[in-house]
């Protein structure tokens, strides 16, 4: 667990990072650097989005899988690294 904490600290120290959320495969936040309402909102919305993106990738090619997802808007950028047991979600300001 110390390794996970170290990784989260390293990510959080990067310029522009607004928050980090670790979500289990059911969409339940395990760890977060954001407040509860924001964490819940991102966890719920991104969980559904990640599952749909993963399904789309597999539908195009059943031998393939989603390895990284990046969404960029005017206000922020959301990066997701899915794993078999959890999803790592990083929200950052793309202009910083």
From Swiss-Prot:
GO terms (BP aspect): microtubule-based movement; visual behavior
GO annotations of cellular component type: centrosome; cytoplasm; cytoplasmic dynein complex; dynein complex; microtubule
SMART domains: Robl_LC7
Nucleotide-binding among keywords: no
Family listed: Belongs to the GAMAD family.
Summary of subunit composition and partner proteins: Homodimer. The cytoplasmic dynein 1 complex consists of two catalytic heavy chains (HCs) and a number of non-catalytic subunits presented by intermediate chains (ICs), light intermediate chains (LICs) and light chains (LCs); the composition seems to vary in respect to the IC, LIC and LC composition. The heavy chain homodimer serves as a scaffold for the probable homodimeric assembly of the respective non-catalytic subunits. The ICs and LICs bind directly to the HC dimer and the LCs assemble on the IC dimer. Interacts with DYNLRB2. Interacts with DYNC1I1 and DYNC1I2.
Protein's name in the database: Dynein light chain roadblock-type 1
Organism this protein belongs to: Mus musculus
Lineage, uppermost ranks: Eukaryota, Metazoa, Chordata, Craniata, Vertebrata
Record gene name: Dynlrb1
């Amino acid at each position: 667990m110390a390794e996970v904490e170290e990784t989260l600290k390293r990510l959080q120290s990067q310029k522009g990072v607004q928050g980090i959320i670790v979500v289990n495969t059911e969409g339940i936040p395990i760890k977060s650097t954001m407040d509860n309402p924001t964490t819940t909102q991102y966890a719920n919305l991104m969980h559904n989005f990640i599952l749909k993106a993963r399904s789309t990738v597999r539908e195009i090619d059943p031998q393939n899988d989603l390895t990284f997802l990046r969404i960029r808007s005017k206000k922020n950028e959301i990066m997701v690294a899915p794993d078999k047991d959890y999803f790592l979600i990083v929200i950052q300001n793309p202009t910083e």
